[in-house]
Curated annotation (Swiss-Prot):
ADP binds at T12, R16, T266, G309, G410, N414. Glycerol binds at R82, E83, Y134, D244, Q245. GO terms for cellular component: cytosol. Its EC number is 2.7.1.30. It catalyses: glycerol + ATP = sn-glycerol 3-phosphate + ADP + H(+). PANTHER family: GLYCEROL KINASE, SUGAR KINASE. ATP binds at T12, T13, S14, T266, G309, Q313, G410. CDD domains: FGGY_EcGK_like. NCBIfam families: glycerol_kin (TIGR01311), PRK00047.1 (NF000756). It comes from Geobacillus sp. (strain WCH70). This is Glycerol kinase. It comes from the Bacteria. The gene is glpK.
Amino acid sequence: MERYILSLDQGTTSSRAILFNKNGEIVHIAQREFKQYFPKPGWVEHNANEIWGSILAVIATVLSEASVQPEQVAAIGITNQRETTVVWDKHTGLPIYNAIVWQSRQTADICEQLKQQGYDELFRKKTGLLIDPYFSGTKVKWILDNVEGAREKAEKGDLLFGTIDTWLIWKLSGGRAHVTDYSNASRTLLFNIHTLQWDDEILNILGIPKSMLPKVRPSSEVYAKTIPHHFFGVEVPIAGAAGDQQAALFGQACFEEGMAKNTYGTGCFMLMNTGEKAVQSKHGLLTTIAWGIDGKVEYALEGSIFVAGSAVQWLRDGLRMIKKASDSETYAEKVDSTDGVYVVPAFVGLGTPYWDSDVRGAVFGLTRGTTKEHFIRATLESLAYQTKDVLAAMEADSGIALKTLRVDGGAVKNNFLMQFQSDMLGVPVERPVINETTALGAAYLAGLAVGYWKDRKEIASQWQLERQFEPQMAKEKQEQLYAGWKKAVKAAMAFK
């Protein structure tokens, strides 16, 4: 009987279940979208029970469509949208409020107060993160402050908090396991990434009872088994968990210090493995835990770019310049340059290394001769410039010069963008055969825990290159183009 690993990839807009075989190949995928809630401008919420329902649906679909029996699943790995926050009643199992999504800005006031009280440096030193509505800590505080009776219940020990991985493990195990892994814990703003413990001082500042928090475990370990009535009468080990970006780093087999990957999704997330040392950034990067495995914790530097693939959606839906995303490549290839045009896609501010939430999008260098092709090309180039900004910060912080960049995500299908990215960075860009690196990373973590794969060496040997893009641009031209980008960003930031 052939065995498989089931990876549950719980994302921001949809849930997916992917079956992988021994060679790390995709056997089948099932996907289901779920509803987004926007109660007020800047707020984004999900219904945690709807997420759970979507997970049950994709599990059933993937097994039946692939004709795989539940007994053939050797283990389950979970990867998830990070930071999104669920608080539920441990007796009824019901959430007391919607899940507050990572993108939601509803805790901006709480963050502002904390900054004014001078806590910035304390939080950064302990957690590796910035005080920002993005992370879970202030979201938990908001729920306790704004849901009637929540604080009393929390003090009595009746409420549980979890990121999405924790919620799904709790549900799948029938409430037997309240756990998270090191990578997800490191995104909460509550976890000390040096002592590897929940931080009492921060919990006190935010007024969050410790009894709400899950146990923090390695990213590759059997946390619990599924209860039979949630998995067709079978008990399957839930054996791996990691936040989506860390899972992608693992799926890309970036196991050596200095290896990095960039995921081009709605935004871009670039992570560099820094080994067993937590490198504190001086250039606006986040210090995060990559994973805990084999009795060790390894760290990463992370850069976040808020707008990447969504800039191409904007060309399609907002400006109606293209009919489908892939047209952007065709148009960009029709011209030799942008003819001096720069697009700064700061629709929701700028992330690493600028961290300016007030700056807005801008276009520079337009002339009467500017065409649609120039504009589309400039929009694609902005993704590569932003990635270069992040890499420059990483190299400065880590002292490691990048040798190659591994890439994944929707936009990596765009050959023009990948070539321009390689030209801008001056290093080869490697696109793998399997683009589902996030789900693959979670599968690998689970498979290692149950002996389905032997070790990381075996996994690294499965990584396959689909295409390598080599830098072809003269250094002088590259520097000139990048200087223009820096000038454009500076001008955009001055216009407020």
